[in-house]
C-alpha cells in the first residue's frame, strides 16, 4: 500500500509542476494589459473602478496660477455619460491613493499597480513647466511616497499634453534628487498626450534627456470616433529596433468592438470608463490566449517582446 501511495504522490507532484510550468509559459507569452480607469478624480472612485476590473487609473491634475498642483479636476466638457465635476484637493487625493496602494493598509487594493496623472498644464505659461515639475515632485514625495518611508507602491506616469512643457520632467527629477530620493524615479514614467507626430514626440524626449520609461498615448473623447492610424505608428515605433516607445495605450474605449480593435493593434493599455467591458473582452476565447491583466510583477517600463 505504501509504495502505491508514494507512486500516486509522485505522479501528482510531476503533474502539478507541469501544470505550473504550463501556466507560467502561457503567462509569459501573453501580453500584459493595463486597464486604465478614466477620470478617477474622487477618492471614492478608486475602489469603484478597481472593483470593476481596473488595475490602473487616470487622474486629472489642475494647477493654480503659481504652478502648484491644486485639484484632481477635469471640468466641462468631458466624456459623454460622465460627471465632469468630481474632484479632491490634490494632496488629499494623494493620501487616499497612498492608502489604496500601500500593502498592509486597510484600504489596500492589490490590483492597483499604475497611476497616470493627466497634468492639465494648459493653464500654465511655458516658462512655468519646470517649476510645476518641482512642485509636483514635492507633493508626491510628501503625500504619496511618505518621504520614502513605506509610501504607495504604484508606478506613476506623468502625462503632459504640450510638447513645449518637457522641462516639467527635468524639474520633477531635479526636485527628487535635491530632496534625497532620486531612486523614486525608477517608479516614474512619461507620456505626451497631445496626439502629436511621433517624430516630434521623440524630439521632445531628446530635449528632456529622457530614454526609457516611455508610454505613448493616443485617443479622443468617447463622444467622437477616431481611427487607429496613429496607434499603429506608435506600436511600430515600440516594436522597431531603434524605437523610443516602451508601451502604447489608447483612450477612451468604452465599446467591446473598439476594445477588440485596440487589442488587435497590439496596445499595452486601454483607458476606459467601463473597466468591466475591457475585462469581458480579455476573457473571450480569442483574446485570453494572447492577453492577460497586468500585475505588480509586470514592469510597465519594459517593452513586451512578441
UniProtKB/Swiss-Prot annotation:
Gene3D superfamilies: Phosphatidylinositol (PI) phosphodiesterase (3.20.20.190). SUPFAM superfamilies: PLC-like phosphodiesterases. CDD domains: GDPD_like_SMaseD_PLD (cd08576). Keywords: Cytolysis, Dermonecrotic toxin, Disulfide bond, Hemolysis, Lipid degradation, Lipid metabolism, Lyase, Magnesium, Metal-binding, Secreted, Signal, Toxin, Zymogen. Binds 1 Mg(2+) ion per subunit. Its cofactor is Mg(2+). Mg(2+) binds at residues 58, 60, 118. It is found in: Secreted. GO terms for molecular function: lyase activity; metal ion binding; phosphoric diester hydrolase activity; toxin activity. InterPro entries: PLC-like_Pdiesterase_TIM-brl. Expressed by the venom gland. It catalyses: an N-(acyl)-sphingosylphosphocholine = an N-(acyl)-sphingosyl-1,3-cyclic phosphate + choline; an N-(acyl)-sphingosylphosphoethanolamine = an N-(acyl)-sphingosyl-1,3-cyclic phosphate + ethanolamine; a 1-acyl-sn-glycero-3-phosphocholine = a 1-acyl-sn-glycero-2,3-cyclic phosphate + choline; a 1-acyl-sn-glycero-3-phosphoethanolamine = a 1-acyl-sn-glycero-2,3-cyclic phosphate + ethanolamine. Dermonecrotic toxins cleave the phosphodiester linkage between the phosphate and headgroup of certain phospholipids (sphingolipid and lysolipid substrates), forming an alcohol (often choline) and a cyclic phosphate. This toxin acts on sphingomyelin (SM). The level of enzymatic activity is high according to Tambourgi and colleagues or low according to Felicori and colleagues. It may also act on ceramide phosphoethanolamine (CPE), lysophosphatidylcholine (LPC) and lysophosphatidylethanolamine (LPE), but not on lysophosphatidylserine (LPS), and lysophosphatidylglycerol (LPG). This is Dermonecrotic toxin LiSicTox-alphaIA1bi.
Amino acid at each position: 500500500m505504501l509504495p502505491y501511495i508514494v507512486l500516486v504522490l509522485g505522479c501528482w507532484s510531476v503533474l502539478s509542476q507541469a501544470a505550473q510550468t504550463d501556466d507560467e509559459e502561457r503567462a509569459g507569452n501573453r501580453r500584459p494589459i493595463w486597464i486604465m480607469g478614466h477620470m478617477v478624480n474622487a477618492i471614492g472612485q478608486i475602489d469603484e473602478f478597481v472593483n470593476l476590473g481596473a488595475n490602473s487609473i487616470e487622474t486629472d491634475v489642475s494647477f493654480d496660477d503659481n504652478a502648484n498642483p491644486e485639484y484632481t479636476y477635469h471640468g466641462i466638457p468631458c466624456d459623454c455619460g460622465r460627471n465632469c465635476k468630481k474632484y479632491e484637493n490634490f494632496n488629499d487625493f494623494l493620501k487616499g491613493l497612498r492608502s489604496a496602494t500601500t500593502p498592509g493598509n486597510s484600504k489596500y487594493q492589490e490590483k492597483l499597480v499604475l497611476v497616470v496623472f493627466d497634468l492639465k498644464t494648459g493653464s500654465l505659461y511655458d516658462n512655468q513647466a519646470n517649476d510645476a515639475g518641482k512642485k509636483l515632485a514635492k507633493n508626491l514625495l510628501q503625500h504619496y511616497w511618505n518621504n520614502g518611508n513605506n509610501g504607495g507602491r504604484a508606478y506613476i506616469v506623468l502625462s503632459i499634453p504640450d510638447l513645449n512643457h518637457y522641462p516639467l520632467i527635468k524639474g520633477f527629477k531635479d526636485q527628487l534628487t535635491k530632496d534625497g530620493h532620486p531612486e523614486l524615479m525608477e517608479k516614474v514614467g512619461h507620456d505626451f498626450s497631445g496626439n502629436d507626430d511621433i517624430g516630434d514626440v521623440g524630439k521632445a524626449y531628446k530635449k528632456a534627456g529622457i530614454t526609457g520609461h516611455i508610454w505613448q498615448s493616443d485617443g479622443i473623447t468617447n463622444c467622437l470616433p477616431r481611427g487607429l492610424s496613429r496607434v499603429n505608428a506608435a506600436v511600430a515605433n515600440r516594436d522597431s529596433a531603434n524605437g523610443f516607445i516602451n508601451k502604447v495605450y489608447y483612450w477612451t474605449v468604452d465599446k467591446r468592438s473598439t476594445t477588440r480593435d485596440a487589442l488587435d493593434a497590439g496596445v499595452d493599455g486601454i483607458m476606459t470608463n467601463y473597466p468591466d467591458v475591457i475585462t469581458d473582452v480579455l476573457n473571450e476565447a480569442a483574446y485570453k490566449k494572447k492577453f492577460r491583466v497586468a500585475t505588480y510583477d509586470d514592469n510597465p517600463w519594459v517593452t513586451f517582446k512578441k
